[in-house]
Amino acid sequence: MQDLVSVVRAIVRSELEARPQSGLGRVEAVHVPDAAGLNQYACDVALQDSQAIYEKVPLSTSYLGQLAPPAVGDVVVVQFAMGDPDNPIITGFVFSEAVSAPEVAEGERLVIVPHEAGESDRIEMRQTAGTNGSRVWKVSLPSGPELTITDAAVTAQIGDFLMQIDQDGGKATVSSGGATVALDGSGEVSIAGDTDINIEAGANLAIKASGNATIEALGTMALKAAKIDLN
């Protein structure tokens, strides 16, 4: 009887070992849902070191609210549910000669969309973890615009145009070249420019000060109107 049990165990062990558990494969094609949404995202995968090609292999995800399907040529991890060769699932991705690992700093997370694109054709999102005051979230576009959010400030830059909102300093600033418009928490507004500053109204223009008002020019000052009233 004991010999029979041993034989059965050996047969079961042999069957389990013969079943595929996981492997690496290269994506041959990517399938997307149709207009009716009847089909799910899936890939045709050619297993490495094997002649097997699996069609329409479904994708797994760590969160049902996100999706990042691979591209043709990507190397993926394929696992077989319950060791069933007819039930493959793509469970992960592996960096390869087609897509190399990007450089990240310690404590930093980088998301590149799309992952296979070059630097001039992708969006980069960087997140830096840390204690309160040192966290950073940054989005960069290949054409130059950048948005950076820290615990204390928000900064947006497009070319020479820079907008900063500083929570600790209680100040918001928009600048370009030598021109700056600044607002602080006390209600003070400052406008400065290295060259000309022009204010033009299509209708009426009113300037009123509850306190003193000073107008000063190092050169010529000109007043022009159909009628000038001085009170």
Predicted ranges, named:
Residues N212, A217-N231:
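Proline-poor, low-complexity alpha-helical tail modules
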Residues M1-G193:
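Hydrophobic packing positions characteristic
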Residues V32, E188, D196, N204, ...:
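Short, glycine-/Ser/Thr-/acidic-enriched flexible segments
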